[in-house]
Regions:
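Cap/lid segment of the alpha/beta-hydrolase catalytic domain
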Residues: 1-26, 34-38, 86-90
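Alpha/beta-hydrolase fold nucleophile elbow
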Residues: 32, 39-52
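Catalytic nucleophile loop
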Residues: 54-58
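Substrate-access "cap/lid" subdomains that shape
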Residues: 59, 68, 77-78, 82-197
C-alpha cells in the first residue's frame, strides 16, 4: 500500500506514488458516504478508529485534504504522539518521509537489486520486493527502507500529522486519543536488541 518510486510517480496522473493504502481508505469512506444509509447508518455521523498502524492511518486521514468531510469523529489509539520540535528535526524523530526521500531510498534498493525499471520490478513479484530492504541493508550495512507507511507527497498528504497539529490544519472534528496495553509487546525483544546509530 505505500511503495514509492520515481517511475511509479511518473506514470501517475497525480505525479505521485505511495499512499495507495490511504487512497483505499478514502475510497472506503466515499463508499460509506454513498451507501451506508441503505444499511441503517448515518453518513453524517461517521467515526474513524485505528489502533497501532491503524491509528497512524487515522492520523493521516485527519491531515489529508482528500478525506475532508468524509468523517466526523476520530479515535487514535497507540499511534505515537506528537514529537517535540527538536526530535522532529532529527532523522530519528522524523514522523513522515517526503515523497522525494522515500523515492530515493526505494530507487537505491531497486537499482542495487538490478530492478532498474517498472517492467523488471513488476516481474520480480511481491515476495522479492517485500524482502529487498532487509537483504539490501544486510549486504550494504545501510539502513534504507522502502516505506511501509504514508509519505508527505503534496497530494494525499500535505504535511506530517505533527506539523498539521502545530499549524492547526488537521480535520476539525472531535478526537479521542489514547493507547492500548502492550501494543507491540511481541516486538519488544527485537526492539531492545536493535542497535541505534
Amino acid at each position: 500500500g505505500f511503495l514509492t518510486h520515481p517511475e511509479l510517480s511518473a506514470e501517475s496522473p497525480d505525479g505521485v506514488s505511495g499512499n495507495y493504502g490511504i487512497l483505499d481508505q478514502i475510497e472506503a469512506l466515499n463508499w460509506i458516504q454513498k451507501n451506508i444509509a441503505q444499511f441503517g447508518g448515518d453518513p453524517d455521523n461517521v467515526t474513524i478508529f485505528g489502533q497501532s498502524a491503524g491509528g497512524g492511518s487515522v492520523k493521516t486521514l485527519c491531515e489529508s485534504p482528500l478525506a475532508r468531510g468524509k468523517f466526523h469523529k476520530a479515535i487514535i489509539m497507540s499511534a505515537g504522539g506528537i514529537t517535540v520540535p527538536d526530535e522532529r528535526a532529527s532523522s530519528r524523530g522524523r514522523v513522515s518521509m517526503t515523497l522525494a526521500q522515500s523515492e530515493q531510498q526505494s530507487k537505491e534498493i531497486f537499482d542495487w537489486a538490478g530492478l532498474t525499471d517498472l517492467k523488471k520490478m513488476r516481474a520480480a513479484g511481491t515476495e522479492t520486493v517485500y524482502a529487498l530492504s532487509t537483504i539490501y541493508n544486510a549486504a550494504s550495512g545501510k539502513r534504507a527502507y522502502m516505506t511501509g507507511s504514508p509519505v508527505v507527497d503534496g497530494h494525499v498528504c500535505l504535511k506530517s500529522f505533527d506539523d498539521a497539529a502545530v499549524s492547526g490544519t488537521l480535520a476539525d472534528v472531535p478526537y479521542m486519543i489514547g493507547y492500548t496495553l502492550n501494543d507491540m509487546g511481541n516486538m519488544a525483544p527485537g526492539v531492545a536488541a536493535f542497535a541505534l546509530d
